Amino acid sequence: MEKFSNIAQLKDSGLKVTGPRLKILDLFEKHAEEHLSAEDVYRILLEEGVEIGVATIYRVLTQFEQAGILQRHHFETGKAVYELDKGDHHDHIVCVKCGEVTEFHNPEIEALQDKIAEENGYRIVDHALYMYGVCSDCQAKGKR
């Protein structure tokens, strides 16, 4: 996404345009397929020669989550990771050995969840599905 789009996205979300917010949003655009922790954001920015304090990073990540720019997940590692909210629903499979995260969408799983909710008198408004296993790379390395 271009800087102009990022500025518009921040303004549309009701957030003031600041240097740290632009840098962090740009970083998530560059790493759109990854799930990044606050520590990852800090490290990547430092590698790029950008110095933003860890407290500021946490604050911006929270603001972005509240504004619907980022989604927060808590995988097995215990620390929060964030990804751009692309507007599409997907679920996650997480490797318990190396932490690799694979995103997927399965219409059959979605339909089954809706059916279970309906059978129990619910209407699903949101959900998150995390599956944990051992990825093929770790299986090949014998990390069962």
Swiss-Prot record:
Function: Acts as a global negative controlling element, employing Fe(2+) as a cofactor to bind the operator of the repressed genes. Regulates the expression of the fbp protein.
Keyword Disulfide bond: no
Binding site for Fe cation: 89, 91, 110, 127
Superkingdom per UniProt: Bacteria
Organism this protein belongs to: Neisseria gonorrhoeae
Assembly behavior: Homodimer.
Family matches, as PANTHER family: FERRIC UPTAKE REGULATION PROTEIN, ZINC UPTAKE REGULATION PROTEIN
Protein's recorded name: Ferric uptake regulation protein
Binding-site positions, Zn(2+): 35, 83, 92, 95, 98, 103
Keyword annotations of the record: Cytoplasm, DNA-binding, Iron, Metal-binding, Repressor, Transcription, Transcription regulation, Zinc
NCBIfam families: PRK09462.1
GO CC annotations on file: cytosol
One Pfam entry name: FUR
Spans annotated as DNA-binding: 1-86
Positions of the UniProt region annotated as Dimerization: 87-144
Subcellular location(s) per record: Cytoplasm
UniProt-listed GO biological process terms: negative regulation of DNA-templated transcription; negative regulation of siderophore biosynthetic process
Family classification: Belongs to the Fur family.
Molecular function terms, GO-annotated: DNA-binding transcription factor activity; transcription cis-regulatory region binding; zinc ion binding
CDD domains in alphabetical order: Fur_like
